[in-house]
Amino acid sequence: MKENKSLHSMAAVPLEALVKEEYRTYQIYTLMDRAIPYLQDGLKPSQRRILFTLWKNSNKGLVKVSSLTGLVLTLHPHGPASVEQSIVNLAQDYTFSNNYPLIDKKGYFGERMETQAAAARYIECKLGKVAELLLFDDMNQVVMVPNYDEKVMEPVGLLPKLPIMLLNGAEGIGTGFSSVVPSFNHEDIIKSMISFVETGKIKKIKPYFRYYTDKVETDEKGRIITRMSFKQVGEKIFINEVPRGYDSSKIYRHLNKHMDNDFLKDYIDSSVDNMINVELIFKRGQSPTLKEVETTMGVISSIVPNYTLITEKGVKVFHTPEEILEVFTVQRVLVTKRRYELLIKDYEDRLMKNNEIIRFIKEKHYAIAEKKANRKDYIDYLSKSKFFYAEYLADMAIYRMTKEEVEKRLLLIKEETSALAEFRKILKSPALLKQKLVDELEDVGKKLSAIMDEKEKEKKRVFAKGGTVKPPTTRTRQ
């Protein structure tokens, strides 16, 4: 019996090389598929899949977070816990979460002092008005690929009108890389983009955290600093702002430390939603000044920006937010140009279709249908008669074979011819293309401001009705 040498012909692979290759594969996977946001749309894959799923199911209105999780898992090859948390994160709107939440919510999704949301089966959400405004207008340009099991299609990247990672900030840690992108104000972003389009010069933008009432500082090392601030009302002193990363448990630990040091006797936390209001109670006979309290109890929090993003060529580290804006604005110019190319193609097709309908009616090709054996023979006849839209014409109802239909199509041809001429004029002129982008940015700015103003009014209406007000919390040393 001959030995099968092929069983032993595989070359030996050193263990070190095998481990390095597997580590590299895992590194690429964590970066590209989980941890780091993409430059094109500012989203991580899980966030993109959530928003795309909501967009496809937007006619359903509010859906349970648990139900949405199940829908997203058809695209996302990971467990439900991470998807549920990503949904909650996209919907949260308290200070230091999202300046512009992409998901509208119903139920308790957490607040500034108590960030933990209710269970997924008790809370509901839908695609947010911000996402509707920014994300889905250019879906005919979005590249679609099969999902992980090749059963449905999903987008490689969306084409937002503004950079989402700069609007809401982004954080992620992958193998060998991390990303820490602070958030910025949409008005500053839009002004900077318009400046770059019109003059080629980008305007600097400053970090912005919605509802944060103190000054956001940047030190000489580039760290972004937020701090605890105090106010005095009569003889009482209150904490009225806390740094990034401080929730109730961290604040209480900080206050309890000062109680242990006998600087503080007690405190009453009356904070609600984004409004921080913690009354400090000192021992009888102790009346520290506001300055003394700030010096003794004040704390700061800092973040070091790290603008690491995924690009078409892989991982890229940007040095400033303005550098990201430059690349993103160039992308928007190309998207605007492609939009008009597609519009021209669409209107050319419309003109051809309307002209064929007129010829079909005037030459009475519909009368030939009764002489054909079946629909296929009739379509073959129309195709031989040089009708490109033969199938559409074969399905036209007989009541439309009238002068009225011809007149309607002639009117459409006039309108479409005029629009087509305008689109071609814009496409041929770089200046007009840039102006269209500027007009779009200005329009987006107004609409986004209106959306956020309406959200603020709605929040005030809820508070006026006593919707989410919690009772003051008194914390005392045991």
Task: Identify what each model region corresponds to.
Residues 1-223, 279, 474-478:
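Catalytic phosphate-handling regions of large nucleic-acid enzymes and associated NTPases
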